[in-house]
Amino acid sequence: MCGITAWAGKSPKHFNKLEFDTILKFNDSRGGDSVGVATDGEIYYGIDKNKSYENFIINQNYLLPQVVPTVIGHARRQSVGLANIHNAHPFGFGELDEGFHFIGCHNGTLTNHIELAKKYNVDNNVNDENNKFI
């Protein structure tokens, strides 16, 4: 199953990216197909050569604010859907002028993803897309 790492403060607090990166590396064993980090309306993905947090942190120059209320990290292990940028987590939708309105991720496969895809007329090869319509 996938691995989720999150940091949340009651209000924006000083954020230590080095500590968060260290925790993300421990989460690598839960993924293997893609990684991602989301905060403050921005989402950064690592796929292919950057599909481990170790490589993602070294090769992907993702920037995080020093003061931030929430950060989500996700290491994806492929279940339904291809291992690609469209299925990487965290996922965002409801775009606003400055970033996404909603950001989320999940651990595991939705057991009724085929029924949801039919009901909402979405591609059932991409189970993460179904979340946008629930």
Residue ranges and their predicted role:
Residues M1-I134:
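Conserved short alpha-helical segments that host acidic/polar catalytic motifs at enzyme active sites
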